[in-house]
């Protein structure tokens, strides 16, 4: 009898152990499946709507529309294609957290139809940490897709913070909180996104401490941070979120009209001066329309942003910041802002109409560019970046989608929602995953060096057909960026390869373009030695691609959008309208 008891007890123990093992194994399998197959695609916002695979970058579409591949990559030669707009307003920002490496952050995502879901991910570990990475807090981000069949770049993120002006912050404006009006925003133009953390740790308290640490590290390098060399002069140039004089002038004008100095004198602009012809792009809280100036008969692009959505998504300051920067700059390779205004429901910005479409579309159709073609476009981008950096402006959103080709074949950089005037460094966590610099991922604070990193990624993508850091999941992309390992094509131009290597240096103090000679170091590289940079600026070089357009108002290089799908924006009340008094 005792033997039977012992035997039965051992069987029961074995059964319990087996049940426990199988239960844990099942839970582990389910968690892994949910994390890999479920949450990441939704949480990253990289796949939005119907998708079809592409081979060697050839774009496909659905329902008769012209498709353009999204930025999610499974293999180097196979991307996800979605029916999308080549709108000038399309872009996205991937969620990043400033928490401790290894800590967990939540993502709450939307699918464009109002549904949301929450996902968790861990911040990639890295040997170097910063003073502000001491808090192990959870941060929640809410994503809203711009449209179900749209580009992954039309996502908008906003913090769960109740303060709408909870915006990006930087070393150069530590008093930003005191300058806020009653309700505030983290604003982006059109369909962009930024992330703001709701960490309980006060980041500003760590700024000075981290500066000392970084300055010591930078002093040990062979290079010198270009921002350190220009710091003194940039202080007098820096402005906080706009020009006060301009704002006062705007207040004196009516909401739907204003006076602008032109070559022929002062012109009084009115919204009625513009005839809307066709929608050429849509975004999260607005659309871009081709329109004609009834007075000059010139074609232009009108970006229309719904104020209710701009406020809801906390994008006020970014929209205003974009307008203020574009109003200040003039360069042959940068989109020109002609006029901006508002009514009781929308914000309006009038730009040059660039009828050739996105460089991204031409690159996907070609698969990859030759070294000569890539050199031409890279040179024009270098010219534009040098100009922006001379004004202490960091662009932060360089990618083929934001490069438009004009009828004459030359580039126009568009979409300045992430651009910002700097004194030293900024802490906004934003960008396109494949183009984000390591210092952004590590939340160290970043400066104009991130634009030179993005240029290296862009040159690589033009030559190879896909970015140097790719993965099915954005977090895999971040890990590869931090590792710095790049797979090189066997037959890549060795001189171009050398330039890319010098641009994709993880230590920003040794990154080409960010040392004491600034952009001159890039312009003197052997890959550009045949160029006369005055000829580049004057557009004297022969473009490698001439868009197929028949007139200045041609829209064949943009997708078609049913006008009936566009619903008028709701008017905002006077309390909300005050946010845009200076627009």
UniProtKB/Swiss-Prot annotation:
Basic and acidic residues bias locations: 221-234
Domain named AGC-kinase C-terminal: which ranges?
529-583
Q: Write the record's keywords in alphabetical order, separated by commas.
A: ATP-binding, Kinase, Nucleotide-binding, Serine/threonine-protein kinase, Transferase
The record's annotation in Pfam families points to: Pkinase
Give the region (Disordered) as residue ranges: 51-75, 98-264
Superkingdom classification of source: Eukaryota
Its recorded name reads cAMP-dependent protein kinase catalytic subunit 3
Its source organism is Drosophila melanogaster
